[in-house]
Regions:
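Short beta-strand-to-loop elements that line the ligand-binding cleft
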Residues: 152-159, 257-269
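Ligand-binding cleft/hinge of the Venus flytrap
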Residues: 140-149, 224, 236-264
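Flexible hinge/capping segments at coil-to-helix
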Residues: 205, 214-233
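Short helices/loops that flank or line small-molecule/ion binding pockets
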Residues: 161-175, 179-180, 265-280
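A ligand-binding cleft/hinge motif common to bilobed small-molecule-binding domains
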Residues: 176-193, 273-302
């Protein structure tokens, strides 16, 4: 049985929550969760404390059976054959089906056909950082991580609500989040706290402008007039920060619900801009960078913090430490500062989620 299942099974047999086990063992709840999900290999002191609380020996509690070091799929491939990336996240070696990313074509680590895997001889899985998020400029950060630390980055395109569960399950090192709140900068901390709980921290990347990417042929020049007009909108998936912005923009009193105002749904900011530029829609919500890159007009609606959420259990991981250093470097700040709509004055700041 795997380390993950054995620890969790014994805890559940006693009817204990992770918080209860943490209290009885003197280990933090975040660390209990990380060890259960194999995101963290326990220290000798932690292993002894957990074993003592559960009335087991360390050997019984943490014995790994059946090749525990083997790589496993982070999530099932959608096709029977294709390419995969490999990365170590915490204590686990994970395989990721290759998918489109904001970084273009990232070299793969092997191919698969049904259940047969054919890895490449040279593999970068120990030197790979996995981020789930939607920053269209992530390539600026990844280029510095490659140059300074020799790290490869796998940037999975995910909305905030889709990225956070991947982080909770120990499938990525960091999750991008932008969650507007009427209270201002508390939005990201609030959504992480309510979705994941404590044991996480936010690394600030930038405060960006989000608004309406608009075809130049549309003469409306205010968001309130846009909301009343009968133009064609391109949507975003539920759970994304951009969709929440669109819902607020279109969902005023007496108006048709936002979901009934569009036929097409884009998967990211550039997808929205491309749909408008290609004539599939007249408008959609995206960050200013994506709109200007596509030659579109832009009406600003709000400013949002874009943060990278990382678990406390991985803060001493080599690739996560490199991520923090890169965000605090003047090189990355200067690159992002030159982008339209990005405010980098607080880049690299760290906030613990209570």
């Amino acid at each position: 049985m795997s380390q993950e299942n054995e620890l969790g099974r014994l805890r559940r047999e006693r009817g204990w929550s992770q918080q209860e086990l943490a209290k009885r063992s003197g280990v933090s709840r975040a660390e209990v969760s990380a060890v259960e999900n194999a995101r963290l290999s326990p220290s000798i002191a932690t292993a002894l404390a957990l074993a003592r609380a559960l009335g087991r020996t360390v050997e019984e509690l943490f014995a790994l059976a059946g090749g525990g070091g083997d790589a496993a799929w982070a999530f099932p491939p959608r096709t029977k054959s294709g390419r995969f990336w490999e990365a170590r996240v915490g204590a686990r070696r994970l395989l990721f089906p290759v998918e489109p990313t904001a970084l273009g074509v990232v070299p793969h680590d092997g191919t698969f056909r049904s259940d047969f895997l054919e890895p490449k001889p040279a593999n970068e899985y120990e030197d790979t950082l996995v981020i789930a998020g939607c920053d269209p400029a992530i390539g600026l950060l990844t280029s510095e991580l490659r140059r300074v630390d020799g790290l490869r980055v796998i940037a999975l395109t995910r909305s905030s609500r889709d990225a956070l569960p991947l982080l909770e399950r120990g499938l990525v090192h960091a999750a991008g989040v932008h969650w507007f709140s009427e209270r201002g900068r508390d939005g990201n901390e609030l959504v992480v706290s309510t979705t994941l709980g404590s044991g996480y921290r936010l690394l600030h990347l930038a405060r960006w402008q989000e608004g309406v990417a608009l075809a130049p042929s549309i003469r409306v020049r205010s968001t309130s007039a846009l909301a009343r007009s009968r133009i064609r909108w391109v949507g975003r998936e539920e759970g994304s920060g951009a969709r929440r912005c669109l819902d607020r923009l279109l969902g005023g009193p007496g108006r048709t619900s936002a979901s009934k105002r569009f036929r097409h749904v884009a998967s990211d900011h550039r997808g929205v801009a491309q749909a408008v530029a290609g004539g599939w829609a007249d408008a959609g919500v995206a960050v200013r960078l994506a709109a200007e890159e596509a030659g579109l007009d832009f009406l600003s609606v709000q400013r949002e913090d874009y943060d990278l959420c990382v678990p406390d259990a991985l803060c001493s991981d080599r690739v996560v430490l490199a991520l923090g250093r890169a965000l605090r470097s003047g090189v990355v700040r200067k690159l992002y500062r030159d982008l339209p709509g990005y405010d980098t004055r607080r880049m690299g700041e760290e906030k613990v989620v209570d």
